[in-house]
């Protein structure tokens, strides 16, 4: 198959060096690229409400239940660098279409799983397919939008769509489970992937690096062996605390990661060009993306707990209310695009961090009787600032690399966000738990029974449960603490 880059619709004027501007076809193609992006993002969170139904039908063990949740994210994160590099070599649209077909088949397999083992295998297959889709979409945007302003807008839309998918996952899951069986949360992927398979060959251009070299199989194995143990260890520490096995897992991943970097430095055709990290703009932007995702995911954990455990909302109602802060991202995206046309990106990014910090500071003032609007407003401010930072970071990263290296650069972006999310849950989760327990030790009513106080110290949900079993006044005082 001949590989080429489809010319943009409106070429630059003769006699100028201005890059060609994208036309209607490219913008329609962007809409097509958002389909897999939304679905892959939603599959991270779509199982939140389905677990009770899956447990009833498939009867998984506690270990199997954890793997049903986590195997998708582990495999996805571990293969992002591999798939970004593979797309540079075999063609990004080709990899996208292969991934879409595989995602559809894996979704069917997950929906009709007859055992926990089958569902775990299907979720792993979804992770493999998802890893082909995420870097392909961002890399193709780099190839489709050559004009800097248009590319900035397209990447901002891509960034907002990623976060929207994560927020929409629980809502879609809740709505489907109200009317259908648990397999419907996977079947919903199929028609959208079929639409992608039909439309992408017409609307999305093919591109592959002309001199990418041979695929580095050993480097691929090393990247998988580096990412998965580190994310596994971090997530386990966030869930159950520190122990030797989890620390060894992280250490092993870091050692393999060092071996991966050594190989990339010596390889003739590396999966990641380490020279990119000599650019302060590229390295700083990757760090910005990681920090922003670190903060977003860590804050989301507390917000969800507050809505359900403190305000007493049902999971679906909490998920619906959690969509309200997305208004902040809808406002932030176009405002950020306009600001960077007139103000240095560094100042806009700093402003985004400052806005996110203000929202976070407001969230620290929440208490048991805070009105819902206060939480949603603070969360919207926080999300808007963080999304502004991520949009700028992604645009700087993709603008800093030539089109031939866009796939590898997109994989770096995705891997950084995966690490940021995992570390955010672990670090902010641990800090939050420590602050919660410290505050409860000081403010808990003296009359609280020792056993009840121990349960309350364990989790916020435990405190709510215990408070409901105590005498009215004592229970209210415990919740207030």
Where is each model-derived feature located?
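Hydrophobic transmembrane architecture of multi-pass small-molecule transporters
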Residues: 10-13, 195, 396, 412, ...
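Helix-breaking motifs and short loop linkers at transmembrane-helix boundaries and internal kinks
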Residues: 59, 91, 112-118, 180-181, ...
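Extracellular/periplasmic helix-loop-helix junction of adjacent transmembrane segments
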Residues: 50-78, 118, 316-320
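Helix-loop-helix hairpins in multi-pass membrane proteins, especially solute transporters
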Residues: 85-218, 236
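Cytosolic juxtamembrane N-terminal segment immediately preceding the first transmembrane helix
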Residues: 1-42
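Central cavity-lining transmembrane alpha-helices of secondary-active solute carriers
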Residues: 70-84, 134-138, 323-335
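12-transmembrane solute porter fold
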Residues: 26-42, 47-49, 245-249, 256, ...
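Hydrophobic transmembrane-helix bundles of small-molecule transporters
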Residues: 156, 178-289, 295, 314, ...
């Amino acid at each position: 198959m001949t590989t080429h880059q489809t010319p943009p619709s409106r070429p630059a004027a003769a006699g100028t060096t201005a890059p060609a501007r994208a036309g209607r076809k490219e913008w329609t193609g962007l809409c097509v690229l958002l389909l897999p992006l939304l679905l892959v993002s939603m599959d991270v969170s779509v199982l939140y409400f389905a677990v009770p139904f899956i447990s009833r039908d498939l009867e998984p063990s506690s270990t199997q239940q954890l793997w049903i949740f986590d195997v998708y994210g582990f495999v996805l994160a571990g293969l992002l660098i591999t798939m970004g590099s593979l797309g540079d070599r075999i063609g990004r649209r080709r990899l996208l279409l292969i991934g879409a077909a595989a995602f559809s088949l894996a979704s069917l397999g997950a929906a009709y799983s007859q055992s926990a083992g089958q569902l775990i295998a299907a979720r792993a297959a979804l992770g493999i397919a998802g890893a082909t889709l995420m870097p392909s979409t961002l890399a193709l945007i780099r190839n489709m939008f050559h004009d800097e302003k248009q590319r900035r807008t397209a990447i901002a839309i891509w960034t907002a769509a990623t976060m929207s998918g994560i927020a929409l996952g629980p809502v879609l899951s809740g709505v489907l489970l109200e009317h259908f069986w648990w397999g419907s949360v996977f079947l919903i992927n199929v028609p959208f992937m079929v639409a992608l398979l039909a439309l992408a060959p017409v609307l999305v251009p093919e591109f592959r690096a002309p001199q990418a070299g041979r695929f580095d199989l050993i480097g691929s194995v090393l990247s998988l062996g580096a990412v998965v143990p580190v994310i596994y260890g971090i997530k386990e520490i966030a869930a159950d605390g520190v122990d030797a096995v989890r620390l060894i897992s992280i250490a092993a991943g870091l050692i393999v990661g060092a071996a991966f970097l050594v190989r990339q430095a010596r390889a003739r055709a590396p999966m990641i060009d380490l020279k990119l990290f000599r650019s302060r703009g590229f390295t700083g932007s990757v760090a910005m993306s990681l920090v922003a995702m670190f903060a977003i995911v860590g804050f989301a954990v507390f917000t969800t707990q507050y809505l359900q455990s403190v305000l007493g909302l049902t999971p679906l109602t909490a998920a619906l209310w959690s969509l309200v802060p997305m208004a902040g991202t809808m406002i932030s995206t176009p405002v950020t695009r306009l600001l960077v046309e007139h103000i240095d990106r560094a100042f806009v990014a700093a402003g985004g961090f400052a806005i996110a910090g203000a929202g976070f500071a407001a969230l620290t003032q929440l208490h048991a009787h805070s009105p819902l609007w206060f939480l949603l407003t603070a969360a919207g401010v926080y999300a808007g600032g963080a999304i502004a930072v991520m949009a700028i970071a992604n645009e700087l990263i993709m603008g800093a690399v030539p089109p031939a290296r866009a796939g590898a650069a997109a994989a770096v972006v995705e891997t950084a966000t995966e690490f940021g999310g995992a570390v955010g849950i672990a670090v902010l989760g641990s800090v939050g738990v420590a602050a919660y327990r410290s505050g409860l030790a000081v403010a808990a009513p003296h009359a609280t029974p020792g056993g009840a106080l121990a349960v309350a110290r364990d989790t916020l949900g435990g405190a709510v449960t215990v408070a409901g079993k105590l005498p009215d006044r004592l229970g209210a005082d415990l919740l207030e603490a």
